[in-house]
Amino acid sequence: MNKLFSQVVGYLKLFLRCAFLLSAVLPGSADALPSFARQTGQSCVACHAGGQFPELTPYGRLFKLTGYTIGQRTALPLSAMVIGSYTKTRNTESSAPSVDFAKDAVALFQTASVFAGGRVTDNIGVFAQVTYDNYSQQNPDTLAWSGHTHADNIDIRYADRLLGPARDLIFGLSLNNNPSVADVWNTVPAWSQYVPTVFGFTGPSTAPIVAQLGQQVVGLGAYTFWNQTVYAEISSYQTAKGAFSFLKAGNQIDTRLKGSNPYVRLAISHEWGPHNVMLGVFGMNANVYPDPAFPSGPVTRYRDRGIDTQYQYLLDPHTVTAQFSYVRESIHGGDVTGVSASAANTLNQMKLKGSYVYRAKLGGSLSYFKTTGSSDSTAYPGLQDDGAGGMTVIPISGSAANNPDTQGWIPELFWSPVQNVRAGIQYFK
C-alpha cells in the first residue's frame, strides 16, 4: 500500500512540475478540462451542464466518482485556462482608493491555471490545478503588484465499481486539499462559485470555516455511491505539512487546525428523463488555533452544519440548473483565544443560483447570497486606530454594526462561441 501511495504521489509531483513549467507558455481558455475530453472521447457538454464549468452532469459525476478513470490514458494529460477581466465600480469612495479599488476600469490578465488530470491506473486518477495569480500581492510602499504561482484544488482518487443486475456500487478514497472538493454537486462550498473579479468589491469575506480551508489542508476521505441514488462521504482534515506539503505549495497558512477534523456528507439523488435532483446535508467540526504562526494553546471550536439541494434539466438545446445551500455555523471559545468578545457566536450563510444555457453557447444566471450572524466588536470591528491617537471607520470591509450581515445579487450573461472559450458580463449589487 505504501509503495502504491508513493507511486501516486510521484505521478502527481511530476504532473505539478510540468504544470509549473507550462503555466508560462500554454495559451488558451477552457471551461472544462480538454484533457478529460481527450481521455473519454466526449465533448465538454457530456460532463458539464451546458458546457459550463464546474457544473457536472450525471455523466460528469460518474466520471469523477470512478476516479477520473473512464476512457484511455493520454500521453500528456494537461490543460490550461486563462482568465482576463475588466471591472468598473460605481462608487469608489475610500480613504485609500488606490488600494481598495486598484485597477478599476482597467482591462487586465487576471489568472492562469494549468490542470493535470486523468487516469493513472485502472483504479487511480488525479485532478490537480496550479494557478498563477497575476495580482497576488501589492507592495505597500510602491503600490506595485506582483504575481505568484500556487497549488489550487487537488484531488487524488482510488475508486472501484461493483455492477450487477440489481446493484451498482461505487466506492473509493480521496486525498485532497479542500473540504468538499471531492463532492460532485455544485452546492457545497468548494464548487458553489460564480466568476468573481479580482478587484471588484464583493462584501466582507466572512464565510463558514468549511469554506476557508482550501489549499491549506490535507484530507483523506472514504465515499460510496449506491445505485446512483445514495452518496455518503466521511473525511478527516489536518493542516498540510511534511510529505503532504505539496498540497499547499505556494499558499500561506491563514487557518491552522489542531489535530484531525472530521467532515461528513450525505446526499440522495434521483434521475428521471432529462431531470435530476439532489437533496443533501453536510457538516464539519474544526478546532483552529488563533495564530497560525504559533500552533499551541487554546483553540476556537467551529461547528458547521449545512443543507443543500440541486435541480437540473438537460435536454438539448436547453440546460436549466438551480442550486440552494444553507450553512449554520456555531463558534465557541473565541473569547479565550481572542478572536471574539463573546464566548459563543453564530454565522449563517445562504446561497441561491439559477441558470439557463441555450445550445451550450448562450446563457445567463442569477445568484443571491445572504450572510448573517452574531454581533461582536472583536470579530467584526468597525473602527481602527487612525495613527494619531484616535479612531476612524475601517473602509470597505469594516462593519459599523459589528456584525457580518451582507447580502447581494449577481446577474450574469455569458457566451461560448466555441467549446473552450467563454465571455461573460456580470453585475454585483
Where are these regions (language model features)?
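Boundary of Sec targeting at the N-terminus
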Residues: 31-33
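The canonical Cys-X-X-Cys-His
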Residues: 42-51
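Short cysteine/histidine-rich metal-coordination sites, predominantly Zn2+-binding motifs
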Residues: 56-70
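Detector for outer-membrane/organellar transmembrane beta-barrel domains
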Residues: 274-411, 415
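N-terminal secretory signal peptides that target proteins for export/translocation
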Residues: 1-12
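Transmembrane beta-barrel outer-membrane domains
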Residues: 73-75, 105-109, 147-151, 211-215, ...
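Outer membrane beta-barrel
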Residues: 55-57, 78-88, 103-242, 258-274, ...
